[in-house]
């Protein structure tokens, strides 16, 4: 998977968690919609 850069969002499963450096704060979360 590509590392996220810029605005990021987490999957609906962990919507409350924010993405940081291509990884969500919760390991179960995955980043998407990365630009």
UniProtKB/Swiss-Prot annotation:
List GO terms (cellular component aspect).
Answer: extracellular region
Assembly and partners are described as: Monomer.
A Pfam family cross-referenced in the UniProt record is Toxin_2
Q: Which family does the record claim for this protein?
A: Belongs to the short scorpion toxin superfamily. Potassium channel inhibitor family. Alpha-KTx 06 subfamily.
Keyword Disulfide bond listed: yes
Where is it mostly found?
secreted
In Swiss-Prot or TrEMBL terms, this protein is called Potassium channel toxin alpha-KTx 6.12
GO terms, molecular function: ion channel inhibitor activity; potassium channel regulator activity; toxin activity
- Tell me the function of this protein: High affinity blocker of Kv1.3/KCNA3 channels of human T cells. Blocks Kv1.2/KCNA2 with an order of magnitude smaller than for Kv1.3/KCNA3.
Q: Give residues where Lysine amide occurs.
A: 35
Q: Which UniProt keywords apply?
A: Amidation, Disulfide bond, Ion channel impairing toxin, Neurotoxin, Potassium channel impairing toxin, Pyrrolidone carboxylic acid, Secreted, Toxin, Voltage-gated potassium channel impairing toxin
Any remaining note in the record? Negative results: does not block the calcium-activated KCa3.1/KCNN4 potassium channels, Shaker IR, Kv1.1/KCNA1, and Kv2.1/KCNB1 potassium channels.
Task: Point out the signal peptide segment.
Answer: none
Give all Pyrrolidone carboxylic acid modified positions.
Answer: 1
Presence of the UniProt keyword Disulfide bond in the record: yes
Question: Which residue positions hold the site described Aromatic residue of the functional dyad?
Answer: 32
Tell me what organism the protein belongs to.
Answer: Anuroctonus phaiodactylus (Mafia scorpion)
Site annotation (Basic residue of the functional dyad): which residues?
A: 23
Q: What are the subcellular locations of this protein?
A: Secreted
Domain notes for this protein: Has the structural arrangement of an alpha-helix connected to antiparallel beta-sheets by disulfide bonds (CS-alpha/beta).
Which tissues express it? Expressed by the venom gland.
Provide the disulphide bond pattern: 4-24, 10-29, 14-31, 19-34
The source's superkingdom equals: Eukaryota
């Amino acid at each position: 998977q590509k590392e996220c850069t810029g605005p990021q969002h987490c999957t609906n499963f962990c919507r409350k968690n924010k993405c940081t450096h291509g990884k969500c704060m919760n390991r179960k979360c995955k980043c998407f919609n990365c630009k």
